[in-house]
Structures are given as C-alpha cells and as structure tokens.
A protein has these predicted regions:
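Alpha-helical transmembrane segments of multi-pass membrane proteins, especially transporters
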Residues: 1-13, 17, 47, 51, ...
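Membrane-interface capping segments at transmembrane-helix boundaries
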Residues: 215-227
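Transmembrane alpha-helical segments of multi-pass membrane transport proteins and ion-pumping complexes
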Residues: 6, 10-22, 52-64, 84, ...
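Alpha-helical membrane segments and immediately flanking helix-loop junctions
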Residues: 53-56, 84-125, 132, 136, ...
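Hydrophobic alpha-helical transmembrane segments
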Residues: 49-57, 175-206
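Conserved small/polar residues in nucleotide/adenosyl-binding loops
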Residues: 236-237
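Hydrophobic transmembrane alpha-helices of multi-pass solute/ion transporters
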Residues: 2-7, 23-38, 182-186, 232-233
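Generic multipass alpha-helical transmembrane bundles of integral membrane proteins
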Residues: 20-109, 113, 117
Length: 239
C-alpha cells in the first residue's frame, strides 16, 4: 500500500492532467478572450458584459482573479469587474441567508460564491438573481459613478473576497498600479461621491437587487426552499 497508493495517485493525476487540462485551458482562454473583447465596447454595454462575465467566472470553478491579472484589467473595465464579482458574492450571501444564516453569509460574502456551484448544477435558475444584479450594477459603476479599479489587476476579479476588490479600488485611488499608470491612471483624493459609488455598487445594491430578483424567481416556482442550502458549511456557532 505504501508504494502502490502514491504511484496510482500520481499516474491518475498525470493522466487526467494530460487528457482533461488542455480542453479546460482552451475553454478558459476563450472565456478570457470574450472578456477582453467586451472591454472594447461602449461604457454602458461594456459595464454589463464585463460585470456579468467576470462575475460568472468568479462563481465558476475557474479563477476570475487569474483572468483579470492576465488581461491586466484595470480602469473602468476593472471597476465593472469588481461590480460583477461583488454582485455574485454579496447577492448569493444575502439571498441565501434564510437557509445558511451567518455562516453562509460570511463564507460567501467574504469567501467565495463558488460554494453555490453544487446548487447551481442542481438548479441553474438559482444563478439568475445574482447574474441579473451584476448586469445592473455593472453599468451603474461605469456610467453613473465612473468607478475605476486601478490597483493590482488581480483585485478586479476578487470582489468582496477578503474585501480585496474594494481595497484594490481604494489603493488605485491613492497609489495606482504600474498597469494602471501605463493606461494613464494617476493618484487622486477620493471624494464622498467616489466612496458612495463604491459602497453602493459593491455592497448595498447587490444586497437589495439579488434578493428581490430571487423573490420573483421563487414566486414563479423556479427557486424553492433549500435550493440555496450549503450542506458543507458549518455555522452552528455563528447562529
């Protein structure tokens, strides 16, 4: 067992990597190219496309942060990406509060909305609310508040995970990253309007929009009690 078990594990891992990794890598690259092309659209449509696509990438078992880093996603497109990621994380966290209570709120709101993937596979309609929320907050970020994420590009794909997305926006205000400076960004003193936009787009609006849209989905019978339950999260001590 000491020899066979590690050998089998290594061989299976290598075989799967050889057969499965290439198509997964190709799909991820294609997805990244779609996001890259979306950044060339007008601010309104770019806000919708980038917000929705990067938000979806955040919840999928792929790395939205890596995609944003590779694409060097900063500026107004980075702001839209932050909006989309926050919509997914805060949206799922708040609209599933009834099922998951405080443990689910923290694990999804500050951790990752990827925890909902098993539920999404079972019932894809649970994904409607946070995705539509991201389609709303994205253009609000780009067209109303002109929210830019000029910190490290990786923060564009982090959302509220450890508050990295919000911190990236703030650091971009006071000390833009090299990638952002190369695109013309400069340090600035954020105004109250800037802070209001960040808080509304990243936290308040997703916390309101996603539950409201999910309520409509529930009334239509698309989402039922228990569809958003996180079986793997232990939150007894947080109740």
């Amino acid at each position: 067992d000491i020899l066979v078990t590690p050998a089998v594990t290594i061989l299976v891992g290598v075989a799967l990597a050889k057969w499965i990794a290439p198509p997964i890598g190709t799909a991820a690259s294609a997805f990244g190219n779609v996001i890259d092309r979306a950044t060339e659209l007008q601010p309104f449509w770019m806000g919708i496309a980038v917000s929705v696509l990067v938000g979806i990438a955040l919840t999928l078992p792929i790395s939205s942060a890596a995609i944003c880093q590779v694409l060097r996603l900063t500026g107004i497109a980075g702001g839209a990406a932050v909006a989309g990621c926050c919509a997914q994380m805060v949206g799922f966290a708040v609209m599933s509060f009834k099922e998951n209570r405080w443990g689910g709120l923290v694990s999804q709101g500050l951790g990752t909305s990827m925890l909902q993937m098993p539920n999404i596979v079972r019932n894809p309609r649970v994904w409607i609310a946070p995705t539509l929320a991201s389609a709303i907050t994205g253009p609000i970020a780009t067209c109303v508040f002109h929210l830019e994420m000029n910190g490290a590009p990786i923060n564009s794909g982090m959302g509220t995970c450890g508050l990295c997305g919000l911190i990236g926006v703030w650091t971009g205000w006071v000390s833009p990253s090299e990638e952002a400076i190369a695109k013309g960004a400069a340090a600035m003193s954020p105004t109250g309007f800037d802070w209001l936009g960040l808080i509304l787009v990243a936290i308040v609006l997703p916390a309101i929009l996603a539950p409201l849209i999910n309520m409509v989905c529930r009334r239509l019978g698309w989402v039922k009690d228990g569809d958003l339950k996180l079986d793997s999260v232990s939150y007894t001590h947080l109740r």
